[in-house]
Amino acid sequence: MARMMRAAAFIEKGRIELVDKPIPDVGPNDALMRITTTTICGTDLHILKGEYPVAPGLTIGHEPVGVIEKLGSAVKGYREGQRVIAGAICPNFNSYAAQDGVPSQDGSYLIPEGKCGAHGYKATAGWRFGNWID
């Protein structure tokens, strides 16, 4: 029998419920995080109002704080039992900023009027990568 977890799931417009879901498997590049605190984001409210088309049963929430329960074999720089935050913005590693090693939180860029930002970026976000949460 699969181990289960509780998750907030979109059921229908105006209705989100806590449901039981199987705990996902951890692949070589994954981390399993036990959520201890999370936020309610504007995205969650848009989903609740039916303004974003999502399938019933979708697990919502994307800005949690928690503890690493299990790490994949290829994950480096973290340890099981460590408190972490999962950011809502993740790079696809195809942008010029990501290919240059700039984290997505710092890879925002401003495009001057009449100019193209396709090949440039300017770090403006101000997040520090690797902050500790205690």
What are these regions (language model features)?
Residues 18-20:
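Well-ordered beta-strand positions in beta-sheet-rich domains
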Residues 1-2, 16:
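Short solvent-exposed loop/turn micro-motifs enriched in small/polar/acidic residues
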Residues 24-38, 48-99, 103-104:
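Glycine-rich beta-strand-centered segment in the early N-terminal region that forms part
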Residues 23, 77, 92-134:
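NAD(P)H dinucleotide-binding glycine-rich loop of Rossmann-like/cofactor-binding domains
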Residues 8-16:
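Extracellular beta-rich ligand/substrate-recognition surface
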Residues 44:
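Active-site phosphate-binding/coordination module
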Residues 41:
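Conserved Rossmann-like nucleotide-cofactor binding loop
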Residues 2-8:
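Short structural boundary motif marking the start of a folded domain
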